């Protein structure tokens, strides 16, 4: 049998689950323990098919709208956050609901409301249609929050009063792209108020920093994550921008395009914030089957963040 070719595998850290995702999954599991199945979940709890399928097997029912849920079963709101109208509708129907919105997203919601109460018009930097953007914009009446996605959008945006503006951002954006958009906003509207640093969360920032470290070392980068995961897609972009000629998103090992990887001597691997470590290990094992793998851990930060689950699930 021919000897396997050698391969250096740079494993980025931090990678995978963040504290908000961990908490959201725990909320669904604890709700199923407390109330039994079915427990309804509005929108995928986190953007990962493997996680969602696992929870579905345990009795979670995933729906897109509250109207699809019966009044007499608990409903959980996803980690991405929801517009204010959603809990209001649940209360009107006297439903039991648990909000699994990531606390770092909730912080952005509070910020947006605080600025609006101070009479400032809100601008949101985010991706149109992403559930987090929809949720944050939905903290204020329709039309009150202006969305910008690119530097080009900043030139087009029409505001009521350039002296009375504030901005917030989606938590899962590219750190570098967002800096450029913020700079464009500040150049056009010098009086604009924003957070001390962008609202991009610690986990998004850390995962992008780790990719910047591994991307130039490797012939290729694989990001384990789902196609609808904003933070995972940003990791692919960051890899491509930082010197990695082949950067690809894979949901799991079976999605690896081996032909595209022919002749590589090194690979970098990371995972989006909603991808379980199990899927990363599956990808590493697939490389071990084909190569003589030497794993090098590249760690750029250590994360110790933990979020408590809501009180309703902590009590018997």
UniProtKB/Swiss-Prot annotation:
The active site is at 132 (proton donor). Binds 1 [4Fe-4S] cluster per subunit. Dimethylallyl diphosphate binds at residues 47, 80, 130, 229-231, 274. Pathway: Isoprenoid biosynthesis; dimethylallyl diphosphate biosynthesis; dimethylallyl diphosphate from (2E)-4-hydroxy-3-methylbutenyl diphosphate: step 1/1; Isoprenoid biosynthesis; isopentenyl diphosphate biosynthesis via DXP pathway; isopentenyl diphosphate from 1-deoxy-D-xylulose 5-phosphate: step 6/6. InterPro entries: LytB/IspH (IPR003451). Its cofactor is [4Fe-4S] cluster. (2E)-4-hydroxy-3-methylbut-2-enyl diphosphate binds at residues 47, 80, 130, 171, 229-231, 274. This is 4-hydroxy-3-methylbut-2-enyl diphosphate reductase. It comes from Ruegeria sp. (strain TM1040).
């Amino acid at each position: 049998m021919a000897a396997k070719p050698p391969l250096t595998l740079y494993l980025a850290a931090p990678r995978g689950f963040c504290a908000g995702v961990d908490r959201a999954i725990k909320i669904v599991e604890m709700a199923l323990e407390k109330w039994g199945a079915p427990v309804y979940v509005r929108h995928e709890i986190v953007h990962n098919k493997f996680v969602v399928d696992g929870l579905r097997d345990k009795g979670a029912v995933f729906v897109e709208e509250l109207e699809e849920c019966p009044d007499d079963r608990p409903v959980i709101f996803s980690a991405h956050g929801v517009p204010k109208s959603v809990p209001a509708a649940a209360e009107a129907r006297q439903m039991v609901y648990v909000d699994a919105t990531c606390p770092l997203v909730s912080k952005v919601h509070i910020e947006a409301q605080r600025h609006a109460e101070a009479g400032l018009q809100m601008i949101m930097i985010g991706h149109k249609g992403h559930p987090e953007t929809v949720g944050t914009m939905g903290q204020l009446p329709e039309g009150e929050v202006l969305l910008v996605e690119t530097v080009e959008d900043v030139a087009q945006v029409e505001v009521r009063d350039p002296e009375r503006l504030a901005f917030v951002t989606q938590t899962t954006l590219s750190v570098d792209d967002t800096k450029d958009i913020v700079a464009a906003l500040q150049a056009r509207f010098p009086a604009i108020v924003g957070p001390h640093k962008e609202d991009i969360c610690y986990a998004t920032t850390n995962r992008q920093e780790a990719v910047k470290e591994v991307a130039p070392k490797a012939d290729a980068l694989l990001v384990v994550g789902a196609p609808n995961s904003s933070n995972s897609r940003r990791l692919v972009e960051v890899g491509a921008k930082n010197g990695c000629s082949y950067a690809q998103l894979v949901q799991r090992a079976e999605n690896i395009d081996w032909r595209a990887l022919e002749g590589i001597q090194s690979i970098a691997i990371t995972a989006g914030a909603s991808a379980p470590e199990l899927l990363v290990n599956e990808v590493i094992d697939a490389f071990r089957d084909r190569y003589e793998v030497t794993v090098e851990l590249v760690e750029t930060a250590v994360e110790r963040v933990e979020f408590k689950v809501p009180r309703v699930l902590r009590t018997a």
